[in-house]
């Protein structure tokens, strides 16, 4: 748990989350690693956490309004839906304190990112993780948003040709393969993610 929370804390700090922030986590708590990993990492960073979980969107929006979190954590599609519900409820961006969105668990196009940022008036970033590796904290964007930064002290990424297994050069498109460097319980060697990057 220390390694996991450290990786997530670094990911959050790289986008500007501090111990002055309050984060609303709108991922489901349970066996899904997203909510718990982000919760632990935010606490390690010193940020306060509102563990809302998923669903009941009008209540989620009311909490955004009433409690004033500065960070929203969810899937991009749910963040977009929440912004639409907030608009329908008559809640405008100037009534919210949101400044950062940490989104993951699904892909996010630039078009969707722009809509979320406009819909909530926040700055958003993407992150990547897999339950097999540790969940969130494997990699994420920093405030520059020029690509994902891997936690290379804990994970060794490679890109391979998915048909031949040949390691490809930097910048080529292929399948992401990851070796864990610090996991003790279930270490993985050249784990084929089936994710194309």
Each PLM stretch: what is its role?
Residues 5-22, 57-69:
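Conserved ATP-dependent adenylate/AMP-binding module captured primarily in the ANL superfamily
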Residues 9-41, 45-47:
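Conserved AMP-binding loop of ANL adenylate-forming enzymes
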Residues 1-3:
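Conserved AMP-binding/adenylate-forming core of the ANL superfamily
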Residues 45-197:
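Active-site glycine/GP-rich loop and adjacent strand/helix microenvironment
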